[in-house]
Amino acid sequence: MKPVNSGNNGGGNQNARPAPPELVSWSGCSLKYYRPQGQPEIRTGADPLKPQQWHLKNLGSIEGKRYTRIKAGEDLNVEAAWNSGLNGDGIRVAVVDDGLDMTHPDLRPNIVDGSHNYRRQSLGENRYSNRIAGHKDWPVPCSEDDSHGTSVAGIIAARDYNGIGGTGIAPRASLVGYNLLAFGDERNILDALSRDIDRNHIFNNSWGPEDDGQLNKPASGWTAFNDTLAKGLSKGRNGLGVLYVFSGGNGAWEGDYSSADSATSSRGAISVCATDAAGERAPYSERGSNLTVCAPSGRSTTPASAPEITTPSVKDKYTDDF
């Protein structure tokens, strides 16, 4: 190791070692995350996975792939927004999910201060401590199973023109993560949906109740839940109101109906259903009169008849299965 000149000619330790990296994930997790040193690396270049991202621009085929359900033009038409200068710059999105890989090189340039870790230390037998498991500002995945939030964040705001991966729909938007699903009791649900409503513009919630074909109500009860959303809608963004986006539900195969799934039918909720690359309802996507909009997604059938969505995953990886 090259000696460090301390500037002290009178002696002292001139072989000082750098401080060890700070562990920000919980020691009980299988995935280990350390606080990055310095600023994110500035990369440039075309995004190599972008040609696979049919949801951004659907040409009716993907090189090297054969699909029977793909139709040119069935996409978000997002390039029109980009060409108008609308790329997410100045917009802050809170990804409320199972975790966020804040070190992923395709996400890190867009991560800003304000994330929150809801994970609690387990005491065994379904008992949990009040102590946060890990660092309070680092809602990083605990295992490979906690990759969903990272993939959702990538769809929203993976960085563009950085020479790696693909690109997000709003590639210059700012991201924060709330790993609500790590410990999603009623208090934390209300806290996550009201956290930083003066700074967050959008709360993305790609989660919901069990797909069991039953009527579901919020764990906190309708009054507390609706009051929380009403506060964000009326007082968030300095009175302009925040946007609450919820998944319309993936339980169509189980007979679920989106209107019966708690949050998705609350006043002010933007409920989103899924379409495949041919522009038709994905077979798992729930129907409902509450649905606000449908957007491109995977089809999730075997064998694959339509392409899935390519997006970041944990530990610098990418996936089309999440």
Where are these regions (language model features)?
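Ser/Thr/Gly/Pro-rich low-complexity, disordered linker/stalk segments of secreted
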Residues: M1-K32
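Active-site core segment of subtilase-fold serine proteases
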Residues: Y33, Q39-A173, L181, E186-T223, ...
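Conserved post-beta-strand hinge residue in the HATPase_c
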Residues: D98, N250, P296
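Extracytoplasmic/secreted cell-surface and envelope-processing proteins
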Residues: T103, D212-L215, W253-Y257, E280-P283
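Glycine-rich, phosphate-binding/catalytic loops in enzymes
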Residues: R108-G114, G221, A260-S265, G288-N290
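Active-site neighborhood of phospho(di)ester-bond hydrolases with catalytic His/Asp-centered motifs
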Residues: N204-S206, V245-G249, V272-C273
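Glycine-rich, charge-decorated loop segments at or immediately adjacent to ligand/cofactor-binding or catalytic sites
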Residues: F246, G251-S266
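Extracellular S/T/G-rich loop segment that most often corresponds to the catalytic His/Ser-adjacent loop
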Residues: D261-F322
